């Protein structure tokens, strides 16, 4: 099994390799494949039931598992979810490695992995993983207000 310290730079290098061989569109196709095979089974099931509230339930679990420094809010009266990643462990690790040049759109995989699934179930993307520099980003969705299952 590969450790996360090895996986993250390998993932970044893979994106670079795919783009050099087949172009940027091939990288996006790769991300779509990852979305369908790995992200959809978890996020899709939650979003089908909870709509925009799935954002809270999904990321409150996954971001804590990754030990990310983040702040997120969800208003179950207005259906507005907002998140600020103050420090993404993946991007941060890449930026700290002196021997690695991060793939130029490394953070782009988040836009492709998550927003399309949430939008299928009524969440509207207001800010799709806008990179803010220094391993941070912001994203926001709104939709029909529903309570979260794991407050």
Task: Identify the meaning behind each predicted range.
Residues 113-114:
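Short amphipathic alpha-helical segments
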Residues 1-108, 119, 124-138, 143-151:
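N-terminal accessory segment detector
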């Amino acid at each position: 099994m590969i450790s996360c310290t090895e996986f993250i730079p390998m993932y970044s290098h893979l994106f670079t390799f795919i783009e050099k061989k087949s172009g940027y569109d091939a990288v996006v196709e790769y991300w779509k494949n990852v979305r369908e095979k790995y992200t959809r089974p978890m996020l899709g099931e939650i979003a089908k039931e909870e709509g925009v509230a799935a954002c809270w339930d999904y990321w409150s679990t996954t971001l804590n598992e990754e030990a990310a420094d983040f702040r997120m809010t969800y208003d179950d009266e207005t259906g507005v979810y907002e998140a600020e990643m103050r420090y993404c462990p993946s991007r941060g690790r890449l930026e700290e490695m002196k021997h690695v040049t991060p793939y130029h759109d490394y953070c782009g995989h988040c836009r492709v992995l998550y927003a399309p699934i949430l939008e299928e179930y009524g969440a509207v993307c207001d800010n799709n993983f806008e990179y803010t520099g220094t391993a941070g980003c912001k994203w926001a969705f709104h939709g029909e207000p529903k309570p979260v299952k794991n407050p």
